[in-house]
Amino acid sequence: EQVIEAPKKEIPKKVTVVMDERALLFDFDKSVVKEQYVPILRNVIDYMVANNYDVTIVGHTDSKGSESYNEKLSMRRAVSVKEKLLELGLSPDRIVGLEARGELEPVASNETEEGRAQNRRIEFNLVRRD
């Protein structure tokens, strides 16, 4: 009798979790994490713990306002998400960085309100622990 083993699924070392346009967005000029996003953040925590990941939280803005202001705003957004993740029970040592990208990496056009709304976001860069 021949036994064939299924190949083990490789867990990637680095993963960027980019939310879709309905997820983890911010109101104009705000850094408050809306309560409606708590279930998404719980899912991120569960995924990180189950797959042994640490996270860098990356904040983004739309292009309204000065570049320097938007950089600061994107950092406030990253800090706000960090605080919410800690409040929800994520171990502080799993948060390995906060980054402010400001308006420099849009995912949609800043020419429309809908596009600007999609750019006011958070991304999670996950790195597996060794």
Predicted region positions:
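Periplasmic peptidoglycan-binding/tethering modules of Gram-negative envelope proteins
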Residues: 1-55, 91, 128-130
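Periplasmic OmpA-like peptidoglycan-binding domain that tethers envelope proteins to the cell wall
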Residues: 31-34, 38, 60-130
